[in-house]
């Protein structure tokens, strides 16, 4: 049984701080995208009352601690961590922000973003704040290895953008 808090720490030799280069690939790792969390960043700034629960349900992200723990294990893997040039979690703003902050110029293919269910439109895919997802930038030649290592932790990993 595991209990406690998570502290984000890694040996310095496992961390790279590099500017993504032309041709690098952004891989989305972890949970699938759904309608949960759409508008969460703006929803947290609104005034709320007793009726808010009826209208704001989609703004609330639905966590998945099992997937979160798998992501933690993956990032502790030195072989994986050394491939990552830059990464970002999916907080406020979803794909737009998490991937958009990684490089100055990106080509994002929303059709490749893994979905929890069908019927999501482009805006929902772009702004969903579904949790337990990370966007990582790796060199094109490291994509297959990154996907394989994620798979060893039972995590989905999908290339969704290029620099």
Which stretches of residues belong to each language-model region?
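Glycine/proline-enriched, intrinsically flexible loops and inter-domain linkers
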Residues: 1-163
